[in-house]
């Protein structure tokens, strides 16, 4: 039997379970199904994503005026395992600490989530992983730097050496830059 390549799968969102708000829609559903299938079949795949503090906004209807509005609530996931790993990413002239959590529930244990809401980061840095697609401009670039650069550094700290890097959409582009930086060092 041929050896399967080890794959690192980078994505901004994952839908593993509907009440775990780490996704917005189709991209997350695809990524979540991919991770679940890989885990079920024992494929050597690790997912890298973001531990969103508030996830994607929920649209609710104001009962009084019958108007829609977006609601954001802080979410806590007690099933995430602390890996004990923290990596650092330089963003806007400052070092941002990025904690690595293992998603270990709902039949998935091969997904690692990155979190900047940790002690030692200033308020702006803590909110980088606040809302999925909640900002544009510099904030979005910071989120993508955490996913890409932080993701590659997390893989190294976890001891996982992929044969293939899959970037689901352009959000993980900074992972490519980090891989180039490693080769040039």
Feature-to-residue mapping (PLM):
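Catalytic cores of carbohydrate-active enzymes across secretory and cytosolic contexts
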Residues: 1-185
């Amino acid at each position: 039997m041929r050896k399967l390549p080890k794959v690192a799968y980078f994505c901004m969102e994952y839908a593993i379970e509907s009440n775990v708000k780490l996704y917005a829609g189709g991209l997350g559903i695809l990524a979540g199904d991919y991770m679940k299938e890989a885990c079920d079949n024992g494929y050597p795949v690790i997912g890298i994503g973001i531990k969103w503090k508030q996830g994607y906004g929920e649209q609710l209807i104001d009962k009084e005026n019958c108007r829609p509005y977006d609601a954001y609530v802080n979410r806590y996931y007690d099933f995430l395992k602390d890996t004990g790993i923290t990596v650092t990413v330089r963003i806007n002239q400052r070092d941002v600490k990025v904690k690595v959590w293992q998603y270990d529930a709902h039949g998935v244990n091969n997904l690692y989530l990155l979190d900047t809401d940790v002690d030692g980061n200033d308020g702006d840095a803590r909110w980088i992983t606040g809302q999925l697609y909640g900002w544009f401009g510099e904030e979005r670039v910071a989120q993508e730097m955490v996913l890409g650069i932080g993701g590659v550094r997390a893989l190294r700290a976890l001891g996982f050496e992929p044969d293939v890097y899959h970037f689901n959409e352009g959000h993980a582009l900074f992972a490519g830059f980090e891989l180039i930086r490693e080769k040039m060092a």
